[in-house]
């Protein structure tokens, strides 16, 4: 990826998502990644603060320009399809926790829990329901910290919630499960349409195109929302 960026002078950004150990994070820094999500959100807050602070110092010593993102709160894990999504309202990051975490760790970017969850419910996949975000909490956390905020677990979120979240302070949005659902559905359709076909390059083009269309639609939504927020 670095070679492609240099060869074509294209702004490819290398991010290591959800790295859970100091050793793994240091490997990423030495490899020249632009940013890392150092995720110890499963730990109690005080342990998360202490270990993230130590990791930030170590990573900046290796690569001073590297952006370090920290995570607090519960947004689940894994790109899975669930029968139902748990109620996120009891697991939201508070503005006080966010301020403490940012001030005591020195992170560049914060990923708080604001109503989203990794994965999607079956009803979301069927288009029967949408995920909703706590916009007021996003605004309060942004005001309390002043740092860029990342939304993880964005798949299945209502479009208007994305627009309002970006206006309230979200800078980065992560989406994965939506892409995988599009890939799976299109692959099933392609195989059904050509049951005797065994050549991958004859099966996969519509699959790749279906994922591309989801990416394009999300980029349009986020870019327009960002322009309005400005």
Task: Tell what function each PLM region has.
Residues 1-11, 18-145, 159-175, 181, ...:
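Alpha/beta enzyme core
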Residues 151-153:
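Thr-Gly-centered strand-to-loop micro-motif
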Residues 196-204:
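Short beta-alpha connecting loops at secondary-structure transitions
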Residues 205, 209, 229-230:
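C-terminal regulatory/interaction regions
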Residues 211-215, 225:
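Acidic, glycine-enriched catalytic cores built around paired aspartates
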């Amino acid at each position: 990826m670095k070679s492609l960026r240099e060869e074509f002078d294209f702004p490819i950004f290398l991010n290591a998502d959800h790295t859970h150990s100091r050793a793994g994070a240091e490997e990423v820094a030495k490899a020249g990644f632009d940013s890392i999500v150092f995720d110890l959100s499963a730990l109690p807050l005080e342990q998360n603060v202490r270990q993230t602070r130590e990791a930030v110092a170590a990573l900046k010593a290796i690569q001073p320009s590297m952006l370090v993102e920290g995570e607090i709160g519960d947004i689940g894990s894994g790109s899975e399809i669930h029968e139902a999504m748990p109620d996120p309202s009891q697991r939201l990051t508070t503005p006080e926790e966010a301020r403490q975490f940012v001030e005591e760790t020195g992170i560049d970017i914060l990923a708080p829990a604001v109503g989203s969850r990794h994965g999607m419910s079956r009803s979301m996949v069927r288009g029967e329901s949408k995920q909703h975000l706590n916009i007021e909490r996003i605004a309060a956390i942004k005001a309390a910290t002043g740092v860029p905020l990342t939304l993880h677990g964005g798949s299945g979120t209502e479009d208007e919630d994305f627009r309002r979240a970006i206006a309230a302070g979200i800078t980065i949005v992560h989406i994965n499960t939506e892409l995988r659902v599009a890939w799976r559905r299109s692959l099933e359709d392609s195989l059904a349409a050509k049951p005797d076909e065994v050549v991958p390059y004859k099966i996969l083009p519509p699959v790749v195109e279906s994922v591309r269309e989801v990416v394009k639609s999300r980029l349009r939504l986020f870019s327009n929302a960002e322009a309005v927020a400005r």
